[in-house]
Design a protein with these regions (language model features):
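C-terminal cap/substrate-recognition subdomain and adjoining C-terminal extension
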Residues: 74-217
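Alpha-helical substrate-recognition element adjacent to the catalytic core
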Residues: 1-125, 203
Length: 217
């Protein structure tokens, strides 16, 4: 890659973070719901289920959870090793770092603010009277939406497609990785690895810097 300005777009669940946010939320419903949601998540990330349909089914299981439960679950989200180094080093070199997720703004907004991400996009949980309805508010952020976000942000900031980098682990990241100048599969499922230009199998997100020639700070 060149020394020109880059756009790095990260998946969130199991990439920027070590956890699947919806699985953390499901634990506040019941052990049975947590197992069911976790199983559906695993199949969706392996590309064996349609993401939008699987997300709709999983979110339905969250109906009745309070927004306070969402805040509590968010407190348990763990950043991936090397996440802060990746973001801060890339930005120090003049690049942009964004995140796009099939997860939820309610959980990702605090992380994006803490990391100082340049842009982020995710689904929104519908709530009424402080309780989740079990529905998504607005269009679903799926594989196509992730690819669109990468292209849209690059165009907005006059960054050539060849200077875009996408990092993800699951089946719904494949289109985004394929559209990027460099697609990086991070601790990824087989379907994602097959679509990637670079594969990182060590749980350290800062290794992305080495692959794109950006020094650590």
């Amino acid at each position: 890659m060149t020394a020109e300005r880059k756009l790095i777009v990260l998946d969130v669940d199991s990439t920027l973070t070590q956890d699947e946010g919806i699985d953390l939320l499901a634990r506040y419903v019941s052990d049975e719901a947590a197992r069911e949601v976790s199983n559906i998540t695993a199949l969706a990330m392996a590309g064996k289920l349609d993401f939008a349909a699987s997300l709709t089914a999983r979110v339905q299981a969250l109906a009745g959870l309070s927004l306070d439960d969402v805040v509590s679950a968010t407190a348990h989200v763990r950043l991936s090793v090397g996440a802060e180094t990746l973001v801060h080093s890339a930005q120090a070199a003049g690049h942009l770092v964004a995140a796009v997720s099939g997860g939820f703004h309610e959980m990702i907004d605090p992380l994006a603010a803490a990391l100082g991400l340049d842009m982020h996009r995710a689904n929104r949980l519908e709530a009424r009277d402080g309780l989740l309805t079990g529905k998504i508010n607005g269009p679903i952020i799926d594989a196509q939406a992730k690819r669109t976000s990468l292209r849209e942000w690059a165009a907005q900031h006059d960054i050539a497609p060849a200077n875009t980098v996408a990092v993800g682990d699951g089946g719904n990241d494949v289109l985004m990785l394929s559209a990027a100048g460099v697609g990086i599969a991070y601790m990824a499922k087989e379907i994602t690895r097959a679509a990637a230009d670079v594969i990182i199998d060590t749980p350290d997100l800062s290794l992305v810097l080495d692959e794109i020639g950006v020094p650590r700070v």
